[in-house]
UniProtKB/Swiss-Prot annotation:
Topology relative to the membrane: Multi-pass membrane protein
Keywords (A to Z) from UniProt: Antiport, Lipid transport, Membrane, Repeat, Transmembrane, Transmembrane helix, Transport
MF-aspect GO terms: antiporter activity; transmembrane transporter activity
Any one GO BP annotation for this protein: lipid transport
Superkingdom of source: Eukaryota
Gene: SLC25A11
Protein name: Mitochondrial 2-oxoglutarate/malate carrier protein
Transmembrane intervals: 30-61, 102-120, 138-159, 202-221, 241-259, 300-319
Solcar repeats: 29-127, 136-227, 236-325
InterPro entries, per the entry: Mit_carrier, Mito_Metabolite_Transporter, Mitochondrial_sb/sol_carrier, Mt_carrier_dom_sf
GO cellular component, one term: membrane
Family the UniProt entry places it in: Belongs to the mitochondrial carrier (TC 2.A.29) family.
Function according to Swiss-Prot or TrEMBL: Catalyzes the transport of 2-oxoglutarate (alpha-oxoglutarate) across the inner mitochondrial membrane in an electroneutral exchange for malate. Can also exchange 2-oxoglutarate for other dicarboxylic acids such as malonate, succinate, maleate and oxaloacetate, although with lower affinity. Contributes to several metabolic processes, including the malate-aspartate shuttle, the oxoglutarate/isocitrate shuttle, in gluconeogenesis from lactate, and in nitrogen metabolism. Maintains mitochondrial fusion and fission events, and the organization and morphology of cristae.
Amino acid sequence: MQSWDPCLTPLELHGALFLHGPYWTPGLFRLIALGTCGDSCTHVRQPPKTWMGATVFVQPLDLVKNRMQLSGEGAKTREYKTSFHALTSILRAEGLRGIYTGLSAGLLRQATYTTTRLGIYTVLFERLTGADGTPPGFLLKALIGMTAGATGAFVGTPAEVALIRMTADGRLPPDQRRGYKNVFDALIRIVREEGVPTLWRGCIPTMARAVVVNAAQLASYSQSKQFLLDSGYFSDNILCHFCASMISGLVTTAASMPVDIAKTRIQNMRTIDGKPEYKNGLDVLVKVIRYEGFFSLWKGFTPYYARLGPHTVLTFIFLEQMNKAYKRLFLSG
């Protein structure tokens, strides 16, 4: 029998230690099958190097999205027409290294946000799981996920601020750039030059984005799947799950982008003559609509969806397959 690792969560123990042993029961399997629900509800703990590896791949998407959201700010002429134009312009002006500007901040954000999110989710999930191993209901799991996501977002806000500023630097004239060397240099200088509270600038829209992403993913996937099944063209199989999760990714992207652009603008803003460019997230939304047009709230949609869509697909397909396996193994016959 494998040795017990005290750092493993109960879910990991169920999946690894009990899989081939006498402890493998329907209750434990059901806990695994129902322990995943959306972006911030993923209960299976992954090693930090997995999150870091993913960040390396999505960093260019984050950079392009941030540049698109800042393009045309304050009724200025848009720097980029499309996301592809932004990507090619950055490569041409800043080189291949340019699209990885802010990578150190992205890695720190992933480490702080994901570690906190999964830690909080694990604790709450275990506290609210019944003595017989029955997991919390759907709505309670959704609430746990939103709480964990919002808490993780708060802890990760300083890294978010550094990331936004570092990815935005290349679009500015040399004399206006902040010139942070890395994420730690950014954090130290922000504290020294602007004060500790600036590290949590934009924490409210950052937390709101985490809540919106969770709520939108769960609601849109459930409704999309039901719509596809009711159409008569789909059966409850992996194709249906794939299509429903793709739709969910689109809905989640559309729902969370206005909050995301407010976060980006607030965290990148400067204080001029003691007065910040924006009062709050609502002020950002009002000014974007007034000076740049309503649909400017969705600038950077393509790279944002390219980042969020695949994650949504994998999350729900995994969940569905686990649920099906549970029903097949323990409920059939």
